[in-house]
Each structure stands twice: as structure tokens, then as C-alpha cells.
Amino acid sequence: MQVSDFHFDLPDELIARYPQPERTASRLLQMDGNTGELIDGTFSDVLEQVQAGDLVVFNNTRVIPARLFGRKESGGKLEVLVERMLNEKSILAHVRCSKSPKPGTTILVGENDEYSAQMVARHDALFELKFNSDKTVLEILEEIGHMPLPPYIDRPDEDADKERYQTVYNQKPGAVAAPTAGLHFDDVLLEKITAKGAEFAYVTLHVGAGTFQPVKVDDIDDHHMHAEYVEVPQDVVDAINATKARGGRVVAVGTTSVRSLESAAQDALKKGTELVPFFGDTEIFIYPGYEYQLVDCLITNFHLPESTLIMLVSAFAGYENTMNAYKHAVENKYRFFSYGDSMFIKKKTA
């Protein structure tokens, strides 16, 4: 298939620049992957879709304030966007400035040059930086960093984004973009889902800035995914096995949860073993033709045209169903992308 097969026209006014006042106030487009049937609703309808005995899997990554503003010691302004924390003192980052810094360059970050870092090495488009401070990278970011809003949210970050561009169940710092399907859940809805008899499990995928990179090839078979760190621990494996044994469904909240679970499944297939815990980088690319191993239902936001994420959804719900759903969403003025509305999709099995 061609990347252009996943194009759709999206008016700018449908790109959500701010979240709804309440997390659960967003709209929910429900789709049956077998019939293609679409039902319009609100996110609280998730409570009707999730059944007793289901396992709802969340990504518990925490978005770090990954954007830093500063300058070279020589004076030129620059912007740093953390891609990954390598250890307590070092990061791998995108650096935007008029002239790429060379190894050995000192940079200063913060409004008053509070911290300095040394350019250690370049790795393709990314730079390795080591901070000269007694504080950890995470402490520095929490003090002077800005929330890394996606490029299509065309505004500076605000104080409210520190809460709203973060799930209520986040636990493990490391993401530079939010797992956005989870932004719609609040504590009350989570309690209601539990009371209904569903169970929860938590994987970790630290979303990288590469999630916003456009696909740069024509044929999707030629695309190579960026690497992201994943954790699928033993308790998740046990919960999945128990859910499947009792006839329940695995409901993945977000494409990052899908990619985490399916990475573990593919790892087990390659090793010829039962499902086992998975810790490490994944470059899994899911597109039409992929056979899902674990996930039965998907909660996901509306994604960018020609992105790997709309390809993932197409593999789950069927290509024609997916493109028809997106056409419906545009015509009915659903809000798109990170702060936008969402879908509940039952997997196409026929």
C-alpha cells in the first residue's frame, strides 16, 4: 500500500488546540470493525462498552517537561527537545539552532543560564548532552523545562498543560509526548469501570518525539519505525492469560498500549514461547496485513493523515472502515489529535 492511501483532508479548525473543560466531556465515535457500523456518543459511553471480565490496559508513562530553551556559550539561541533520558546526567535530544553544535560545545539552558551541558556526541539527527550539575536530568527538567506540546498545537505551553497533557494514572517519567487516549479518563470513570467488574493492567511505553515525524517513503513497506522503550511486566502477562482463559477481552487504551502488548506477543512468537515479560526497545510497525495477537478492542484518538497510527488503526478495524470513520468524523466536526476526541473500536475478525 502507498502512504497516500491514508490521506484525508482535515480542516484546520478541527485540530484541537485545548482540551475540553472536563476529561470525559470529549466525544466518542464507536465502531464495529466487522460491520463498519458507527455510533456517535460521548466518552462516558466507554462505561457501556467495557464489560465485566474485560482487561483494560493503560500506558502509565509520565510526560516529562522535555523542552528547554537556551543558548550556546558563544551566544546563539537554541531549543532542546529531549528524546530520551540516558541516565541521571545525560540525555539524547533534538537540538534546534542556526548552526548545529559540535562535540565539545557547551550550552546554557534556562531563562538565566541556570544550567550548563556539554555536547558529547552526535547520533544521526540526535545529540548526546551531559549536564554539569549535582541535580539529575529529571530534577532540572521539572524545574525549568516546558511541556512538549505537539507541533500541531500551535501555541506556547501553559500552566494548565502540566496537568491536562498528562494522564491521571501516570507513574513512570520518560515520555516526551502523551499517550493521548488516556487523557479522557478521570478518577471517577476509572472507579465506575472497576465497579462494573473489569480489571486494569499497566504497561509502559515512553513515547518519543519520533511519533510526530512524517512517513518519508511512498510505499509503507519501506518505512522503518523509530525505537521506543517498552515494559510489559509479569503481572500484565498473568492478567492477559487469565482474561483470555475466562473469555474476556483485552481493551487497549491507546496505540502505545497496543504497540507494547503486540511487541511482547511478537517477541514470544519469534522465540517460540508462551507470552513472557518484555523489557526493551520496540520498532514494531503495525499496518494492514498485520495479525493482532492480543488486543480485542482499542480506544484511540483521531490521528494525522498518512501517519503510522492511522495505519495501525486500519490494521485493527479494516482499511475501508477506518477511512470511512475518519470521513464521518470530519463531516460531523469531531476534534482531532492529542487534545481531541476519540474512538472505541471492536477488532475486525472476519
UniProtKB/Swiss-Prot annotation:
Keywords, A to Z? Cytoplasm, Queuosine biosynthesis, S-adenosyl-L-methionine, Transferase
Under Enzyme Commission nomenclature, its number is 2.4.99.17
User: EC top class, in one word?
Assistant: transferase
Q: In which pathway does it act?
A: tRNA modification; tRNA-queuosine biosynthesis
Molecular function (GO) terms for this protein are: S-adenosylmethionine:tRNA ribosyltransferase-isomerase activity
| This protein's GO CC annotations | cytoplasm
Question: Which superkingdom?
Answer: Bacteria
Compartments, as annotated in UniProt = Cytoplasm
What is the catalytic activity of this protein? Answer: 7-aminomethyl-7-carbaguanosine(34) in tRNA + S-adenosyl-L-methionine = epoxyqueuosine(34) in tRNA + adenine + L-methionine + 2 H(+)
User: Taking the first listed entry, what is the main subcellular location of this protein, grouped into a coarse class?
Assistant: cytoplasm
Gene Ontology BP annotations: queuosine biosynthetic process; tRNA wobble guanine modification
Q: Which InterPro entries match?
A: QueA, QueA_dom1, QueA_dom2, QueA_sf
Question: Which family does the record assign?
Answer: Belongs to the QueA family.
What the protein does comes down to: Transfers and isomerizes the ribose moiety from AdoMet to the 7-aminomethyl group of 7-deazaguanine (preQ1-tRNA) to give epoxyqueuosine (oQ-tRNA).
Which proteins does it associate with, and in what oligomeric form?
Monomer.
Name of the molecule in the record: S-adenosylmethionine:tRNA ribosyltransferase-isomerase
Q: Which species is listed as the source?
A: Vibrio campbellii (strain ATCC BAA-1116)
Q: Which gene encodes it?
A: queA
